[in-house]
Amino acid sequence: MIRLIFLGAPGTGKGTISSYLKEQHGFFHISSGDLFRFYAKEEKTALAEEIKSYINNGLYVPDELTNRTVADFYHKNQSQDKIIFDGYPRTLNQCEYIDEIIKFTHVILLQPTDWDMIINRLSLRRSCPQCKRIYNINSVDFKPKVANLCDLCKVELIHRKDDDPSVVSTRINVYNEQTKPVIEYYKKKNLLHVVDANKSFEELYKLVLEIVNK
């Protein structure tokens, strides 16, 4: 049984690698951002209404509610053999909470050596609003087959506002400051594996597979 956490700032490749692990190796993918959107849209529960009250008002979802949401979704899907957590945990409080529920097997930190490359990668990123598949319009391997259309859903791709270069630097700085304690937490538990996020996707994917298959 594999319980994997991906850590890394925006643009380091967490979502793309997670998608490939899901499609090619049967991993179940839990993304905190997607979870909030799912609960707010699909679920008809008190928990969903609570999440909706924050999202609809543009407010940050507090740790306590994030923890309950992830735990609720995990309990409904814990029979899955291989699960990826992407974007969670992001704070020390979240780490301590979820470690009482789940025994993680691997924590992979995608850490760039060149941040300018990451900022450029994000500025070229496009995503499908339906299936969440990620594309890069300047990459031979990751651009859509038909310009600006998702290969799977055939809907128009979007460029998220928070992927604009003017916003990306702030997102990266906030993420790095926020996750320093998380990185130290899993380092002390001897679960942390650090991978250079500036490597090509093929190299990154190969390294990740080597880690999870140990």
Curated annotation (Swiss-Prot):
| Gene Ontology molecular function | adenylate kinase activity; ATP binding; zinc ion binding
Report residues binding ATP.
G11, T12, G13, K14, G15, T16, R125, I134, Y135, K199
A GO biological process held by the record? AMP salvage
Where does this chain mainly localize?
A: cytoplasm
Q: Where does AMP bind?
A: S32, R37, L59, Y60, V61, G87, Y88, P89, R90, Q94, R160, R171
Q: Can you say where in the cell this protein is located?
A: Cytoplasm
Q: Which reaction does it catalyse?
A: AMP + ATP = 2 ADP
- Show the segment(s) annotated as NMP: 31-61
InterPro entries of this UniProt entry? Adenyl_kin_sub (IPR006259), Adenylat/UMP-CMP_kin (IPR000850), Adenylat_kinase_CS (IPR033690), Adenylate_kinase_lid-dom (IPR007862), P-loop_NTPase (IPR027417)
From the UniProt entry, list the residue stretches annotated as the region LID.
124-163
Q: Which Pfam families match?
A: ADK, ADK_lid
Q: How does it assemble?
A: Monomer.
Q: Domain comment, in the record's words?
A: Consists of three domains, a large central CORE domain and two small peripheral domains, NMPbind and LID, which undergo movements during catalysis. The LID domain closes over the site of phosphoryl transfer upon ATP binding. Assembling and dissambling the active center during each catalytic cycle provides an effective means to prevent ATP hydrolysis. Some bacteria have evolved a zinc-coordinating structure that stabilizes the LID domain.
This chain's function reads: Catalyzes the reversible transfer of the terminal phosphate group between ATP and AMP. Plays an important role in cellular energy homeostasis and in adenine nucleotide metabolism.
Could you tell me what this protein is called?
Adenylate kinase
